[in-house]
From Swiss-Prot:
This is Mediator of RNA polymerase II transcription subunit 29. One of its GO terms (biological process) is imaginal disc-derived female genitalia morphogenesis. It is found in: Nucleus. Component of the Mediator complex. Self-associates. Interacts with dsx. Component of the Mediator complex, a coactivator involved in the regulated transcription of nearly all RNA polymerase II-dependent genes. Mediator functions as a bridge to convey information from gene-specific regulatory proteins to the basal RNA polymerase II transcription machinery. Mediator is recruited to promoters by direct interactions with regulatory proteins and serves as a scaffold for the assembly of a functional preinitiation complex with RNA polymerase II and the general transcription factors. Required for female somatic sexual development.
Length: 188
């Protein structure tokens, strides 16, 4: 028995459809070929894993579940305490769900959501700052070509030179401020 064969019963039209969709070739020994998953799908899944907003969306289900368990365990604990206070029933025999454990799980989900939202907000602020101070898009390839005025994306070496100029300007301003502060302190 071949483990690669599906043992599902098929009707005539389904069998014909499978036969037509299978690659044409002589029936014989099955050749095992390694199939590689398409690269764009993998990159999309990796980008989705890295996206903070999608992480927040995936945490909403566990957050709802932990909130439900927390409220349910607190209601059960209140009911058991009320019965014990009224001396109606002995509460030692029943299994009481751990309210503190469920509350801790709820807060852990809230903390994870908060971290992902803060990270997404910081990424958005960084992107806005980047768009403000360097409005042209950057091509990811290293290529040395001439750049006509307003031709679109700037090359990576041009981007590196722009960053170097910005860093040097910031250092010059920093050094000027330090020397001015030292001159003021020496004058006093």
């Amino acid at each position: 028995m071949n483990p690669n064969m599906n043992m599902m019963p098929m009707s005539g039209p389904q069998m014909m459809q499978v036969m037509q969709s299978s690659p044409s070739g002589p029936p014989g020994p099955v050749q095992h070929q390694q199939q590689q998953p398409p690269q764009p799908l993998q990159q999309q899944q990796q980008a989705e894993k890295l996206d903070n907003i999608s992480r927040v969306k995936s945490l909403l289900g566990p957050l709802r579940e932990s909130m439900f368990l927390t409220i349910r365990s607190s209601a059960f604990a209140l009911q058991q305490n009320n019965l014990a206070d009224n001396l109606k029933r002995d509460t030692g025999a029943h299994h009481v769900p751990r309210f503190d454990k469920h509350l801790e799980d709820f807060y852990a989900c809230c903390d994870q959501i908060e971290i992902h939202l803060k990270t997404a907000m910081q990424c958005l602020q960084q992107q806005n700052s980047s768009n403000h101070y360097l409005p042209g898009p950057v091509t990811p390839m290293r290529m040395e070509t001439f750049m006509p005025d307003n031709a679109g994306p700037i090359s990576y070496p041009t981007y590196l030179n722009t960053v170097r100029v910005h860093i040097q300007s910031a250092k010059d301003i920093h050094d000027t401020l330090i020397s001015a502060a030292q001159n003021i302190s020496q004058a006093d």
